[in-house]
Regions:
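Immediate flanking context of iron-sulfur cluster ligation sites
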Residues: 1-10
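Structural motif
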Residues: 8, 130, 137-138, 226-228, ...
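Conserved SAM-binding loop
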Residues: 10, 141, 238
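Helix-loop-helix hairpins in multi-pass membrane proteins, especially solute transporters
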Residues: 16, 21-25
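Flexible, low-hydrophobicity surface segments
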Residues: 25-189, 207-210, 216
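Conserved beta-alpha junction segments in alpha/beta enzyme cores
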Residues: 197-240
Length: 240
């Protein structure tokens, strides 16, 4: 339990993690690894095609890829969860030797919003617009080396008008809550009830009442956000 204390398993309640630990311990004790299953027919358990690369750490990710003449890019991000961007000063960053360019929302033609369910996520916050969270992209800096890139990002100055923020889902649901998005803070409203929870609690021998919280996390990512792109014929190949 101590070794996996920093792992929050929301899918199986640690079942698969504990099974994997016990299996690894058994293999270490026996000193031999059983052969991979040869039967890949329907209904049989088979290994993932990329499992060996992931568990041994030999997989290649975009951050491991280097190309000749590669340019490095990174975003300057908002310092406030909710603030209006008054001005973006990029002159000093652009003048730094080795900087290829500094791009803002004004340099994006057409649609500047993305999103899975609702396209309400600004790729970059334009002057006059309001940030939605701590880390919204303000501008994108491109440079010849990672060191120059870091220097250039530090030279970008942003003027903000700090605004009241929303600190929790409960605050977001209040009638007078600041709007994180112009269309409202609620994406959808659903009411689901199964059984009689009040009756179940009343009949329970032991009842524990407490406030529980876990840190926010995005699951499934094995590396920070990164992408590598290069010209490919008439288009662009993106590795991400």
């Amino acid at each position: 339990a101590y070794a996996i204390r920093n792992n929050i398993c929301r899918c199986t309640g640690y079942v698969k993690i504990i099974d994997a630990i016990l299996l690894a311990a058994e293999l270490f004790r026996k000193g031999e690894v059983p052969p991979a299953p040869a039967d890949w027919s329907l209904g049989q358990r088979v290994p993932r095609v990329d499992v060996e690369e992931k568990v041994t750490g030999t997989g290649i990710y975009p951050d491991d890829i280097y190309l000749d003449g590669m340019i490095y890019g990174s975003a300057v991000r908002s310092q406030y969860p909710r603030a209006r961007v008054l001005a973006i000063h990029t002159e000093e960053a652009r003048a730094l030797p080795g900087v290829v360019g500094v791009f803002t929302a004004e340099d994006i033609p057409g649609q500047n919003k993305v999103g899975h369910l609702v396209k309400d996520w600004d790729t970059m916050i334009a002057v006059g617009d309001i940030t939605h969270y701590l880390g919204d992209a303000i501008c994108l800096v491109a440079a010849e080396t990672p060191e120059i890139l870091a220097q250039a990002k530090a030279l970008v100055k942003v003027d903000y008008e700090e605004l009241p923020m929303v600190r929790s889902p409960r605050e977001a649901m209040l009638p007078d809550a600041p709007l994180v998005h112009r269309t409202g803070n609620l994406l959808t409203h659903k009411h689901i009830q199964r059984g009689n929870p009040a009756e179940a609690i009343a009949k329970s021998k032991h009842v524990l009442t407490q406030h529980f919280s876990t840190p926010w996390t995005e699951h499934a990512f094995l590396e920070p956000e990164c992408a590598v792109a290069y010209p490919d014929g008439d288009g662009v190949m993106v590795l991400s």
